[in-house]
Amino acid sequence: MAAEGDSPARPRVYFDISIGGKSVGRITMELYADLVPKTADNFRSLCTGEKGIGKSGKPLHYKGSVFHRVIKQFMIQGGDFTAGDGTGGESIYGNKFDDEAFPIKHEKPFLLSMANAGPNTNGSQFFITTVPTPHLDGKHVVFGEVLNGKSVVRQIENLTTQSGDRPAKEALIVDCGELTGDAALAADVKQPDALGDPYEDFPEDCTDTLDAVAVLKIAKASKDYGNTAFKSGNYSLGLDKYQKGLRYINEEPELEDQPQSIKDELEALRFSLNNNSALLNIKLEAWDDAARSASAALEVGGVKDADRAKAFYRRGLANIHLKDEEAAVRDLTEANKLAPNDSAITRELNGVKTKAAARAAKEKAAYKKFFT
């Protein structure tokens, strides 16, 4: 064991990441400086920014650059700090440098590998694998791996993308650098989050067997952690926990040999996690997401009328803010049928009906004026 203050044999570096302007955590990485020293030092130096200004006139530094290309079940790509779109970048050795060696195969997720435009065209762009990618062996130089922050990588991987596989929300390297001393030694130790949640955020990264009982346990814990965050006023964290629970349930564990009670609990959790997500999306004014979450809740069968009323009500609220009065009236009418004594539902239903009637009258008057 290394003495206090020592550093690991291999360099360890970090990225602090934000998505859509919201801090989502840190990715810590270890570099294979013993196997591909030139490639590893290029990445390390670009993390620290120690080489100053490059030939492009831009700092040789990943800080402030983005992950510009994301392909689910493949990889996330970044490192273009000059153009930001995959057409730029620059190594510390000049524009490009040769492939150093291929000692490591792309045989697991969370490997760091150099992006290129063909043989011997390495610059600053890199990618992090999210699955094994053996078809890249011998073509791209693997030079490190992710130690911690795998959930951050998964969050980037799961972003909605637009043209050119670019994330719709900006995935930004807010800060980066090299870890030394105790910080480097602790870089591979998974730390429970602020709520004490010990489980991986994404089921594909869980090393334990995910049978129905395990999925139920983690999903229930995720709901509890979400409720704790909600009660403390941390709506974003609460939503993250509810969505985490759903990711585990959506693994669809084998249920054939399980008692009916397990199946019923999983379905009840599927409803409550979606319905709670709808509520927190409303708190966060994420109206599209609120409507989607409420719709997912309403797809679950065997739910009590009072709970279905909440889901219809929440989708109705979302539709009001999405300016879809017709859909809002439908949802709130259904909610009112299921919970006729709920004053909040009645109030919102009457309000949206009044708005719809006023708008219709205004349009009718405008048409009448147009044709007279």
UniProtKB/Swiss-Prot annotation:
It catalyses: [protein]-peptidylproline (omega=180) = [protein]-peptidylproline (omega=0). One of its GO terms (molecular function) is peptidyl-prolyl cis-trans isomerase activity. Its EC number is 5.2.1.8. It is found in: Cytoplasm. GO terms for biological process: protein folding. TPR repeats lie at residues 219-252, 271-304, 309-342. Keywords: Cytoplasm, Isomerase, Repeat, Rotamase, TPR repeat. It comes from the Eukaryota. Residues 14-178 form the PPIase cyclophilin-type domain. InterPro entries: Cyclophilin-like_dom_sf (IPR029000), Cyclophilin-type_PPIase_CS (IPR020892), Cyclophilin-type_PPIase_dom (IPR002130), TPR-like_helical_dom_sf (IPR011990), TPR_rpt (IPR019734). GO terms for cellular component: cytoplasm; intracellular membrane-bounded organelle. PROSITE patterns: CSA_PPIASE_1, CSA_PPIASE_2, TPR, TPR_REGION. PPIases accelerate the folding of proteins. It catalyzes the cis-trans isomerization of proline imidic peptide bonds in oligopeptides. Belongs to the cyclophilin-type PPIase family. PPIase D subfamily. This is Peptidyl-prolyl cis-trans isomerase D.
